[in-house]
Amino acid sequence: MRRQLRRQSEQYGNIRPKPADAVLIGAGAGLSAAAGLTYSGERFERYFSDFREKYSITDIYSGGFYPFETLEEYWAWWSRHIFYNRYVDAPVPVYDKLLTAVKGTDYFVLTTNVEHQFQRAGFDKKRLFYTQGDYGLWQCSRACHDRTYDNEVTVRRMLDEQGDMKVPSELVPYCPVCGAPMTMNPTW
């Protein structure tokens, strides 16, 4: 698997755009998978084996839809899901190589990826459009208002303080406007 990811990364790293007025980069889940952000196999086992054993969840994506009994369990899952996909650099430098390939050109990125690896690699934030949201943001589950909220500090605390696949109740995020539980920003 690693050899295949490395080979794919090298292929992406050798792409050189032809002269053009502008470059539009379209990217989906395949780019992140090539960068090593896989949702199954060894990576899933490393971070989520306890959830697999208790709930029979088979991969990271499917776990996002699991009907956990408590918000403490829900946020234990999601804090790991968010952290290991949004706040950790991709293991294979696909995004870095893509940035090198378009450096000095007028580019724009349109992506369905929600883990913001483009920003982590140094792509200009003003040249990115994430059609399906951002793992780094929460929003009201009732949509009582349009604001989103950065979650990094709380996600890191949830990760540090969780035990037995639960976060402490005081870390469960609630909407500051209506009091409903917060939810993820991705819009799938």
Model-derived features: positions:
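Conserved catalytic core of sirtuin-type NAD+-dependent deacylases
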Residues: 1-188
